[in-house]
Amino acid sequence: MAAEALSENCDIVIECLPPQLFRTVGVSVIDRGKIFMPLSVGQLLEHWDLVERAKKTGARILAPTGALLGLDAVRAAAEGTIHSVTMVTRKPPSGLEGAPYLVEQGISLKGLKAPAKIFDGSAREGARGFPANVNVAAALSLAGIGPDKTRLEIWADPALSRNTHCIEVDADTARFFMAIEGIPSENPRTGRIVPLSVIAALRGLVAEIKVGT
């Protein structure tokens, strides 16, 4: 079955595709008014017109928490005023190799002996430069103050065996810090908890009781 034909036979389509296929599937699902659950949340930032299309067709776009934590607290804080959101991601070099940003900048991680900061910028810029690595930053930005105001640092650390994300949020209602150490899956660019997050999101659609925001 062609990817774009999935929406003809499904009520919910979960996307976990290479970036170049994101729009094809997204348009098909949204134009039919179905539920679109993208794991490549960073690609949603690049194709924001899909959100406008969803408003017209009645489709829903559900971004799962993925490898993050605390999005409920960020969303709640966003109902007031969030002053700043900063995320620091640290990954083993193998989980970052081949990222477009590294290729464009001519940065090699081979033989890295000590932690190295390889990116410092906005969540939007990070999602564009590391499309397979920091979809979590895109999700965080959508829950909070947006992709241009959310700050992101990415570090390559050869001493790590887990993908780590540390988040600091400063708001008028609270200041909080969150950290998670995710066990990588067979694909070192993502974590084992990501598919479980999708399952939890699907259960939430039909559960008798909903826990969390």
Task: Write out the residue ranges for each language-model feature.
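Short loop/edge segments at beta-strand edges and connector loops
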Residues: 1-2, 63-65, 154
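N-terminal glycine-/serine-/threonine-rich beta1-alpha1-beta2 phosphate-ribose binding loop
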Residues: 1-28, 171
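General beta-strand structural signal in soluble alpha/beta enzymes
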Residues: 15, 38-39, 61-65
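Rossmann-fold NAD(P)-binding glycine/threonine-rich loop
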Residues: 20-28, 32, 39-60
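Gly/Ser/Thr-rich loops at beta-strand to alpha-helix junctions
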Residues: 42-45, 65-71
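Rossmann-fold dehydrogenase core element
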Residues: 49-68, 83-87
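Active-site-lining helix/loop region of Rossmann-like oxidoreductase modules
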Residues: 67-213
